[in-house]
Structures are given as C-alpha cells and as structure tokens.
Amino acid sequence: GHLGVQMQSVGEVMAIGRTFRESIQKAFRSLEVGIDGLEPKWAFEKDPELKRARLFDLTSLRFATSFRLLKIREAFVNGKTVDEIFEITKIDPWFLHQIKMIALEDYSSPIKKLKENGFSDAQIAKNTNSATEKVRNSRIKNKITPSYKLVDTCSAEFKAKTPYCYSTYDHENDIEPIKGKKIMILGGGPNRIGQGIEFDYCCVQAVFGLRELGYKTIMVNCNPETVSTDFDLVDRLYFEPVTFEDVMNIIDFEKPDGVLVQFGGQTPL
C-alpha cells in the first residue's frame, strides 16, 4: 500500500479449508469489511471507501494493497488472462488460476460444489436472486452441512491431539460434539481500530471463569495473533469466521448450553 494521512488497521485473519479456494473465501469473509468472499464490484456500492479501492485499473495491480486480490478477480471477470495478470503482479500462476476459478464460477452449479469452493450462503443468495435464509434452509434440508476436521500439527507422522478445528464440506467429521455442560464464546475477530486485544483479554477471562463453574469451553475466532486462539486454552477451538452462517453451523453441531457474545467487542454483537 501507500503511506497516507488516514489511520489504518493492521489486523489479520487466518482461514483453514481443504482447498485454497475454500480458504481464501473464508479469509475474505472473516475480514468484516462488508464482503462475503471474493465479491463482484456491485457488492461495494453502499460503501464509498471500498468502492474507491475497487476501481478497476490494471496498473494498480502492481501494488500489494489490501484489495489487490479483489481487483485481480475483477480483471478475470473482465476477460483478462492469467498471463496478463502475471506480467503485472508476478504472483505465481497457480494462485491466479485458483482466483480465476472463483471469479468465473457458475452459480447454477450444485450448492454442494459451491460450498466446497468456499462460497457463503450470502454469496450464493446474491448471485441467484434468492435470500440468505432460503439458501441456508435449502442446504440444511438437503443435508449439505459442513464437517469439522482437526488440524494435524504433526503432518500425519503420529496422531495429533490438539482440539483445533475447522469446517469443510466433506463427508466425515474428525470430531464428535463435546459431552457435558459447555458454553461457546465468540471471539473478537481481526484486530482493527476500536477493536483490539482488550476484548481478547475479556474472552480469555471468561474461559477461566467458566472453568471454575465446571463448564467445558468452546472458542470461535479467526485471529491468529490472539491468546484466545491458543489451542491449549479452551476445550475446543473453532478457527472459523465469526459470521452468522459459520457460528450457526457450529451451534447446530455442538448444541452448547449457552453462547457468550458480549466479550468479543463489536464483532459478536
């Protein structure tokens, strides 16, 4: 990016999936900037800041701004080739091909295929002239729900025992719902102006308090630079976007006795 007079946040997110396409889409919707993935241009009409950042200009692709991948997506929609984008950005063609596949996705494809490529219910709804709730209900009715995998910190050398999970649209779960009394805590998501580590401190203290009361604890967060995403802090960590869809998927799976939303700042509320 470029230095300027406007204060900007330095927060980050981390997303995990079975494929790059699934992961990058989850990462973008974790950012909490009003987008649900690699979005088309019209998704920014209501936000002048994002709209200005998305003005289509191939020469600007040389600069590694926070919106460059969205601009690359727009370039593919406008018919540019992988070779053309590579000459400007020098991004490895493999990644460019993956972004191109997202950009040119056929939304008439089966929902299962769209979900495997990381498309959210909101994205599918907007691109099929439907409603998010209708897409969600149809998906659940047809048993198209995510499975949850454990992060293998040992590269399959021996069995990993870390309670560190992510969702994907696969057939099998690596885990079962936690047994006993359990409470879910929604983390603060990415750090940004007005949303910092003070909220993460509150989430961690909530974990300690719940343990004293005899509850198992479940954390949902997508910020890799926080204490709340340390895998050994809680009984189970879901490294997922803190969005309605992703949180409700976890609630449907775990069926916790309660959910604490007041400790994570603006995001959970």
Language-model-detected regions and their locations in the chain:
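ATP-dependent carboxylate/acyl-activation modules
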Residues: 1-269
